[in-house]
């Protein structure tokens, strides 16, 4: 094989590798929560996403007034604003499937067990910039500390 042929083969292999990486992936938004026994952003929805063999599961996080990060899409639980409540005030809140509101710590620990599932974390915005900035720092530190 001459240098010209080697160059063509190498270029084709590189293009093939790039096309594999650029393929569309399926993400379970808030986990696979329409399944029986599941609820949005629940640990069950995370496990069900893995069982469905999707590429990843997106989930939303909010931080309480005392700095505990919880997994929840809305900025309220019932009529309680998560960012104004302490974790103690909301920790027993039930999701539609009966699970209690998961913390980010619990969610990441569960996600770590699901080796083929990518976790896509969305930090929900907060009207209070200082609270939002602290949430970002807390979340990034937790993810790094867990080696994820």
Predicted feature locations:
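Bacterial Sec-dependent N-terminal signal peptides
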Residues: 1-24
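Phosphate-group recognition and catalysis centered on beta-loop-alpha active-site segments
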Residues: 22-148
């Amino acid at each position: 094989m001459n240098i010209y042929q080697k160059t063509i083969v190498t270029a084709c292999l590189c293009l093939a590798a790039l096309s594999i990486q650029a393929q569309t992936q399926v993400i379970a938004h808030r986990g696979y929560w329409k399944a029986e026994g599941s609820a949005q952003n629940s640990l069950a929805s995370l496990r069900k996403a893995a069982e469905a063999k999707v590429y990843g599961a997106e989930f939303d996080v909010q931080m309480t007034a005392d700095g505990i990060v919880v997994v929840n899409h809305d900025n309220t639980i019932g009529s309680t604003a998560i960012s104004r409540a302490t974790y103690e005030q909301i920790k027993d809140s039930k999701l539609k499937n009966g699970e209690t509101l998961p913390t980010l710590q619990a969610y990441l620990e569960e996600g770590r067990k699901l080796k083929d599932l990518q976790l896509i974390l969305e930090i929900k915005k907060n009207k209070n910039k200082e609270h939002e900035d602290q949430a970002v720092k807390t979340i990034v530190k937790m993810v790094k500390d867990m080696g994820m």
